[in-house]
Amino acid sequence: MKTLTRNAYAKVNLALDVLRRREDGYHDVCMIMQNLSLYDTLTFTVEEADTLTIALACDKAFVPCDARNLIYKAIALMGETYHLTGHVHVELVKRIPVEAGMAGGSTDCAAAFHATRELYGLDVSDQELMKLGVKLGADVPYCIMAKTALSEGIGEVLTEVAPLPDCFVVVAKPTISVSTKMVYENLHANELQHHPDVAGMVDALKQGDLSGVASRMENVLETVTTKLYPQIEEIKQTMKESGAENAIMSGSGPTVFGLYTEKATAEQAAEKIRQQYGLSEVYVTQPC
């Protein structure tokens, strides 16, 4: 029997631009992706067996633990691709908010790819894992890479960039559910009046210029979500009024995050948001 434990880190989009809708229904995007210190923990156990079987357990009852789960799908895809056998059991401790725009499912999926490779001693590169990962989700290749990156194409074309300078990141998930599909269907990329300065952000990251990064934070999907869910804009404004360098929505939402230079200021802002909006999923994190 072999056992392995991995942490799977949340991500936010420091910038998110949508360039066009493709004929295959996906959208070409241009994003800056950053990992945060908020993470799920996955413990994998493999026992010998003649065929591949997968069992998944989670500490949160609302998380599906069957073939719908991306962890399950990743192990099954690895098994099919590399002809693996054995009974794989996974224990998931879930801390990243679900359906939050923070790649919680994708990062767990990436952890499953990495763990399966290690447990079975497979001579498989990260690039090969990323090619498999994109079959399961556009954010999965980034989560396999797990470094600050410029993300293009549908999210699978990745270029490592300098990480976000030291700061504190307050993350707040409103108690609303946002459909990514609905957001993209209601976005008219060709009619957008403004686009994020992604190239400028890459330069600011290279220079370690936190204020330069913050001033370029922008997410074009907010043009859809803030009209439907005003609380997203309200939380952004509360973060800014509470000392954030800037605050935007991550991914397709509804999570909002803000950058702070001081831990005490970040913690005070987090507590204010918990109290003012009655939210339980509010965290003070750091880039990682």
Predicted feature descriptions by range:
Residues 59-60, 219-222, 255:
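A short, structure-level motif marking secondary-structure boundaries and short turns
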Residues 50-64, 112, 207-217:
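Short, basic/glycine-rich phosphate-binding loops at helix/coil junctions
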Residues 42, 71, 90, 112, ...:
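Hydrophobic packing within well-folded, soluble alpha/beta domains
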Residues 63, 101, 223-224, 258:
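A generic structural signal for short
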Residues 91-120, 138, 245-260:
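Glycine/serine-rich anion-binding loops at beta->alpha junctions
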Residues 1-100, 118, 122-130, 154, ...:
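ATP-binding N-lobe of GHMP and related small-molecule kinases
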Residues 76, 80, 114, 118, ...:
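Short, well-ordered alpha-helices that flank and scaffold nucleotide-derived cofactor binding pockets
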Residues 2-7, 15-17, 21-31, 122-246, ...:
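ATP-dependent small-molecule kinase catalytic core of the GHMP/sugar-kinase superfamily
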